[in-house]
Amino acid sequence: MNTDIQISTNQYKNKELIELWSSKIPPNQHEIDKIYELMNGTIKFFETFGINYHIVAGSALGQARNGGLIPYDDDVDFGIHKNDVEKVLKNKQFFINRNYKIEKAEIGIKLGTGDITNSAIKQKDSSNTIMGPCKPFTGVNQDIFLFEEDGLVDNIPVMRYCSKRAQLTWPDEVIPRKGWFNPEKGIFGNLKVNVLPKNNLDWYLEKSYGPLWKTHNGQGDKLENFECTLHSRNKLLTKKD
């Protein structure tokens, strides 16, 4: 495993991304509940239609380090293979029936609650795909990124974002191909989710966030609180225990 942070361009050395995190407004409890409910519905969708998926980016970090949603995070990030996107769109009524919004996007698919914003409508191209960075819904938002097999890193075959913009924004977010196709189960808040096998997950998170991802935040500060935010129902159960 490469621990040479001097040559890394991981997110914890990217000033623009660190400033973005620092400016995030933590979700309130109502929003947290909606985030978990949308996540739960998405997992059920993938399981119903036999789609391999992973939680990625900050959601993978939150699962491995905090056990769920990082307190400042306001969405969940999923990843699926590019070959499965048409299956998602073909069966989008699953989400619509549950009052969720679904839109095609440059990165893959955007899901959420509330109404689509005017700015998101203006960002659509001729194929009705939202282009560029965007939180398109007035409620909570969720990304489903598309991945594909793409080259080697440290002689390890990896999966990368299909979106060129995503590759430029998160160049070190590469997932070991072996782990991608052989997921295990982990806990995210109160939900059971697909996760990479531990050695693949550690490698992925170190590439993405550097060797101190388990103990430090993006500003280089040692973390004192490793808790996650929970759905209110789960918080009540925890208090009773």
For every predicted segment, state its role.
Residues 1-38:
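N-terminal regions immediately upstream of nucleotidyltransferase
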Residues 43-76, 85:
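Active-site nucleotide-donor binding segment shared across nucleotidyl transfer reactions
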Residues 24-49, 95-203, 208, 216-240:
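Conserved catalytic core of two-metal-ion nucleotidyltransferases
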Residues 75-80, 193:
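Short cationic amphipathic helices and targeting signals
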Residues 70-71, 93-96:
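Short, surface-exposed basic-aromatic patches at helix termini and helix-loop junctions that form
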Residues 81, 86-91:
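Short amphipathic alpha-helices within nucleic acid-binding modules
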Residues 8, 13, 31-34, 51-62, ...:
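Short, well-structured secondary-structure segments
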Residues 64, 81-83, 196:
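Generic hydrophobic alpha-helical membrane-span motif
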